[in-house]
């Protein structure tokens, strides 16, 4: 399997090359040259693999389709070392939890940091360490987080050989629990940078540093954000696991509702659907920062600046510039790299928007790719949390509540709807308290977390300053 950039760069890169590189040299995002398509008989085989050998073996089978430069026995060992009951607290790794016979939640938050990001990040940490040791190299990971990516990355990379993590986050815009998870880490290879701005400022800094090829190569800069194909690929696996749990036969269709900010999670669903997984709808659920909902409703993709990005009670979705969206647009435009380059590298940079409403591809988006969307507000998510708690005796976090609210708007007869869980409720205790009048249960391992000493550096959203900081700490 070879990989190409959404903006046209194609030098025959293989998986391990793009694992370490992250962003393509032309500023585009890597995708495989083609998506392997699984027919009904292969889906039936994979269902049996999942039911008899578990999640780790399913991950190995699916990753093998995209990874041919890691020996099979090594990839097998990496998958089985990553997806264990001891790491994820459940032998199913990602169990399905029913709310009603037609509506369920895929529990993705059983990992070390209690968020779905662990599902990919734990594998990424093991892949990085494996490949860096094989090459005898080091990697400096530069990332941006709106809350959960940062802690998932840091817990996956802490103590790993040959890896440093420089994680940017919007200063004061994460929940107290999220901040404590990250800033309490004292490992020598972990550096937390609190940026005076919003998540989009952090993400722009990461892209700017990654686009400086000389700096990137001098300081061996890599990324764990979902612009890294390896992370998105790892997320594809749980769509298959969710499908196999929600159905009994390979011809049945399922819809997935995905709380969305950066478009990485639902983009993995897009890849699974392109591979032949029988997905009816991919439901994009946004919060008040509804840039993606606006696009799927109108064809207009209009990013917002920091001043117009709302601070909400589902903060991990407070994003107005969805970095993974470029991958989907590339596919929607029949992989026209020239057009994708024009839209994202030129038009979006100069005008802050583009409009596909009059193009033939937009009229067929739902039919070809299954995408539908909706928006949820603070009032909606509080009511949804209350309703789920009263009616089903379950607590869900505010992002998952956004997913449930929009999922209910897109139910189809005889098609199971699976909502992808974002995090455990304790990560957003204040919102849960407001909604239900009670604090969510605190896992024993995290009881004194928010009282722990913290280590982080505050800086403005200045690319030169972050480069200087990285250079200073990579000596």
Predicted regions and their residues:
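PLP-dependent amino-acid enzyme catalytic core
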Residues: 1-475
């Amino acid at each position: 399997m070879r990989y190409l950039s959404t903006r046209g760069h194609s030098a025959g890169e293989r998986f391990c090359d793009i694992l370490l590189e992250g962003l393509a040299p032309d500023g585009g995002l890597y995708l495989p040259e083609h998506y392997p398509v699984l027919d009904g008989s292969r889906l039936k085989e994979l269902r049996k693999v999942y039911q008899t050998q578990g999640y780790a073996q399913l991950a190995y089978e699916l990753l093998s389709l995209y990874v041919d430069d890691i020996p099979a026995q090594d990839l097998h060992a990496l998958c089985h070392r990553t997806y264990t009951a001891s790491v994820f607290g459940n032998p199913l790794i990602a169990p399905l939890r029913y709310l009603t016979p037609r509506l369920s939640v895929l529990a993705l938050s059983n990992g070390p940091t209690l968020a779905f990001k662990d599902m990919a990040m734990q594998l990424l940490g093991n892949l990085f360490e494996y490949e860096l040791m094989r090459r005898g190299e080091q990697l400096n990971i530069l990332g941006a987080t709106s809350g959960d990516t940062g802690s998932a990355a840091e817990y996956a990379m802490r103590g790993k050989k040959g890896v440093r993590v420089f994680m940017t986050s919007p200063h004061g815009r994460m929940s107290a629990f999220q901040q404590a998870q990250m800033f309490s880490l004292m490992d020598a290879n972990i550096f937390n940078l609190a940026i005076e701005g919003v998540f989009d400022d952090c993400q722009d800094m990461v892209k700017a540093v990654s686009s400086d090829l000389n700096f990137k190569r001098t300081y061996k800069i890599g990324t764990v954000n979902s612009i890294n194909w390896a992370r998105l690929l790892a997320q594809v696996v749980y769509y298959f696991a969710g499908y196999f749990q929600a159905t009994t036969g390979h011809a049945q269709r399922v819809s997935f509702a995905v709380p969305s900010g950066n478009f990485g999670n639902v983009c993995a669903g897009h890849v699974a659907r392109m591979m032949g997984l029988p997905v009816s709808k991919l439901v994009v659920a946004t919060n008040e920062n509804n840039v993606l909902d606006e696009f799927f409703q109108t064809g207009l993709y209009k990013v917002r600046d920091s001043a117009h990005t709302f601070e909400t009670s589902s903060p991990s979705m407070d994003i107005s510039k969805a970095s993974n969206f470029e991958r989907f647009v590339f596919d929607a435009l029949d992989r026209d790299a020239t057009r994708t380059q024009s839209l994202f590298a030129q038009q979006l940079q100069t005008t802050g928007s583009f409009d596909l409403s009059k193009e033939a591809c937009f009229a067929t988006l739902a039919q070809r790719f299954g995408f539908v969307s909706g928006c949820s507000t603070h009032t909606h998510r509080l009511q949804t949390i209350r309703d789920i708690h009263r009616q089903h005796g379950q607590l869900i976090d505010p992002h998952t509540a956004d997913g449930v609210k929009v999922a209910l708007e897109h139910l189809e007869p005889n098609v199971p709807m699976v909502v992808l869980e974002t995090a455990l409720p304790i990560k957003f205790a204040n919102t849960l308290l407001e909604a239900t009048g009670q604090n969510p249960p605190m896992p024993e391992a995290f009881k004194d977390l928010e009282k722990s000493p913290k280590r982080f550096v505050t800086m403005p959203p200045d690319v030169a300053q972050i480069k200087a900081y990285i250079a200073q700490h990579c000596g």
